[in-house]
């Protein structure tokens, strides 16, 4: 793919050649409607035959706009023969009395092995300039499906090892669980997601489905090329690829941004239910899903609720989140980047997401300002998996001791700022020294950031992580300099770095 900047061009090609919207209906008079009103992303269509389309049906234009057909989704019945629809692409060029056909089916997308290594838009059209899909390797499924029955769901108690120390030790992820990455702008949510995709594809050989919801086109392009370079996507043998990308980017209408997560989730559900796989489902960014819903809600004329969000916020979030679960066939482990407006966790958008999560990874601006990456807050991040029953007694005790030391250091910082280190007791001085080493040891070089940092990425096993921090809290490494703990992998790397610093006379 040359660039996702050419997306519109390739979308046009794929739409003309093969559309995934079911248009195989007789063009009877009662299935054709006329545009009577256009309000940017919301369009009113009149059906004179008296038979209006069902809610969530897709309507497709009879003519092309900017090289492709326009698809609308029915959202409201506002009279006996008029429906209000959400546009899933730009309405530029649309005018009154233009004709639309009721497809008599919801939006549908391709699913199956043929989707691996490809990039799609919300309608399931390929946008990567790699040609059409192989027809024998995919089927078409609607983006709306039932939530798995309670009897089919499985309780998740197995840890998903990410290779990232701060996560595996203090806020471990459950296989089949839902994880929220919380953070303001520019603290590293997308980089952390890219590293998780890289590590899990390499360590677990699992399929990842990535939903780009309302984020930058440049980031989507970077992620695609990073996956090619790391081998997650194999351009020569698509079947060997381990990821599917579905994008509804920042420049697209709110309808596309609202539905793209469901398109990607439908692809993930196929791998779980039909191929019995453990799937990783990444969403970047779940806040944009909420934001696009708010835009659509205002255009549809609904009365807003708190802070201007849509009154259906909790229902829309629940309808998507409840489909992300483990079943007897396989699991979907979801990692969702959640932008926090003005770093306010009480904002309704991130607050609504909290109820659905098993783990929260909070990215802190204060930690990123210290130059510690990933900038995960070890005290604010939580996980239901951090219990002795799931992670084991040793891991649990080490994690709690690390948190105790860091919490004590945090409570001493005001005293240090006012009176200085000399006024602390010897015990407190020791805790501060260990806490500063722990803080730096929680940093880690990432594989996906090698081109920026020049440092090779590190994948640290869970056993190494627990044993390294156990030695640290027990005081086995009190003699090593603080600088040796910064941006390394395991404790063996710390010892090597300490020896190097000593040779160079920097300690």
Curated annotation (Swiss-Prot):
HAMAP family: ATP_synth_beta_bact (MF_01347)
Membrane-topology descriptor: Peripheral membrane protein
PANTHER family (UniProt xref): ATP SYNTHASE, ATP SYNTHASE SUBUNIT BETA, MITOCHONDRIAL
UniProt record similarity statement: Belongs to the ATPase alpha/beta chains family.
Origin organism lineage: Bacteria, Pseudomonadati, Pseudomonadota, Alphaproteobacteria, Rickettsiales
Function comment: Produces ATP from ADP in the presence of a proton gradient across the membrane. The catalytic sites are hosted primarily by the beta subunits.
Principal subcellular localization: membrane
Assembly and interaction partners: F-type ATPases have 2 components, CF(1) - the catalytic core - and CF(0) - the membrane proton channel. CF(1) has five subunits: alpha(3), beta(3), gamma(1), delta(1), epsilon(1). CF(0) has three main subunits: a(1), b(2) and c(9-12). The alpha and beta chains form an alternating ring which encloses part of the gamma chain. CF(1) is attached to CF(0) by a central stalk formed by the gamma and epsilon chains, while a peripheral stalk is formed by the delta and b chains.
Source organism, top-level taxon: Bacteria
Originating organism: Ehrlichia canis (strain Jake)
Binding-site list for ATP: 183-190
Gene: atpD
Name the record gives this protein: ATP synthase subunit beta
Subcellular location, record wording: Cell inner membrane
GO cellular component: plasma membrane; proton-transporting ATP synthase complex
EC identifiers of the protein: 7.1.2.2
Region Disordered, residue ranges: 1-22
